[in-house]
């Protein structure tokens, strides 16, 4: 059983994968997307799905702190709907409030990574945190 976690943004999708037993999440990569050009990185996702034999996706939902949904929640759900259509693999959603903040804090405090380097890995780490939270709550 492999679960793929996604942190869907307007310019990038952070990707993480679980270990085969579903205990831990590891960040994989960041896929560049372009919403204006309808380029959502599905070709690369297809390669990763095949490579890791994914049988579930977990997509982070960026809810507001008061638990309301904003436009990015709708965009994330639309992305999930499209994934289900394309790959015929179930999609679950995980509250991702503050995961990017937590990821940035980890990179600053624990890894002492410069701002430029943080931008290159933060979405991947956020996807890892989203997936790990899902695994901790469900397995």
Curated annotation (Swiss-Prot):
Gene Ontology CC, one term: cytosol
A biological process from GO: rRNA 5'-end processing
Keywords from the UniProt entry: Cytoplasm, Hydrolase, Nuclease, Ribosome biogenesis
Gene Ontology MF annotations: nuclease activity
Protein family membership: Belongs to the YqgF nuclease family.
Organism taxonomic ancestry: Bacteria, Bacillati, Bacillota, Bacilli, Lactobacillales
Subcellular location per the Swiss-Prot or TrEMBL entry: Cytoplasm
Pfam families noted in UniProt: RuvX (PF03652)
Main location: cytoplasm
Organism field: Streptococcus equi subsp. zooepidemicus (strain H70)
Family annotation (InterPro entries): RNaseH-like_sf (IPR012337), YqgF (IPR005227), YqgF/RNaseH-like_dom (IPR006641), YqgF/RNaseH-like_dom_sf (IPR037027)
Disulfide bond sites: none
Protein name, per record: Putative pre-16S rRNA nuclease
Function: Could be a nuclease involved in processing of the 5'-end of pre-16S rRNA.
Record EC number: 3.1.-.-
């Amino acid at each position: 059983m492999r679960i793929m976690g996604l942190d869907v943004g307007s310019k990038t999708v952070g990707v993480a994968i679980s270990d085969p037993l579903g205990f831990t999440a590891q960040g994989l990569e960041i896929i560049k997307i372009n919403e204006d050009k309808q380029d959502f990185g599905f070709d690369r996702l297809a390669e990763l799905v095949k490579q890791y034999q994914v049988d579930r996706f977990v997509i982070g939902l960026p809810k507001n702190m008061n638990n309301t949904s904003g436009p990015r929640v709708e965009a994330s759900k639309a992305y999930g709907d499209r994934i289900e259509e394309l790959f015929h693999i179930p999609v679950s959603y995980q509250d991702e409030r503050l995961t990017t903040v937590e990821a940035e804090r980890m990179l600053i405090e624990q890894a002492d990574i410069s701002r430029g380097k943080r931008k290159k890995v933060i979405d991947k780490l956020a996807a890892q945190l989203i997936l790990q939270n899902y695994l901790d709550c469900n397995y």
